[in-house]
Amino acid sequence: MAASVFCCLRWCRDGGAGHIPLKEMPAVQLDTQRMGTDVVIVKNGRRICGTGGCLANAPLHQNKSYFEFKIQSTGIWGIGVATQKANLNQIPLGRDVHSLVMRNDGALYYNNEEKNRLPANSLPQEGDVVGITYDHVELNVYLNGKNMHCPASGIRGTVYPVVYVDDSAILDCQFSEFYHTPPPGFEKILFEQQIF
């Protein structure tokens, strides 16, 4: 009897038969393989400076995604979503069908068309946090946690968070551990998992 109990305890301690160790999911961050040639990414893939754009390393697969950008230094910048076909050396983004962005002047652009605009008294300033929600149809903007009721749509296909900077702008990205609580139903970007 004692031998069988010992055997059982050893089996549990060693992880049991067929134990598969869990791999830690990679962190969502700015992707140094998908950025403009004059872009600088620092702070473990969380800060962008220089000139040009950069995609995040994870596409928006889930139904309702949320992410944030904090404006550390003003200048020319834009944030939103883009496909892998977006030209990250040609800014501002939003000039073609490969990106939908809010620019630093509060205008939301897609395919070189202004789709919406933030109120003039609600333009993001240095230190502000801009939240983005995306549900595969509509992109919405939040300023310091407040819904700006400024939706834009049109982009199709697999999209990624995108950010571009120029003229001394510095932006920090938050893909988790947000400054503000995501709106109901929206959550951080999840990596797609394949099980087989």
Curated annotation (Swiss-Prot):
Pfam families found in the cross-reference section: SPRY
SMART domains in UniProt: SPRY
Domain B30.2/SPRY positions: 1-184
Record-linked PROSITE patterns: B302_SPRY (PS50188)
Coiled coil: none
Gene3D superfamilies noted in UniProt: 2.60.120.920
Protein name as catalogued: SPRY domain-containing protein 7
Organism: Gallus gallus (Chicken)
Annotated gene: SPRYD7
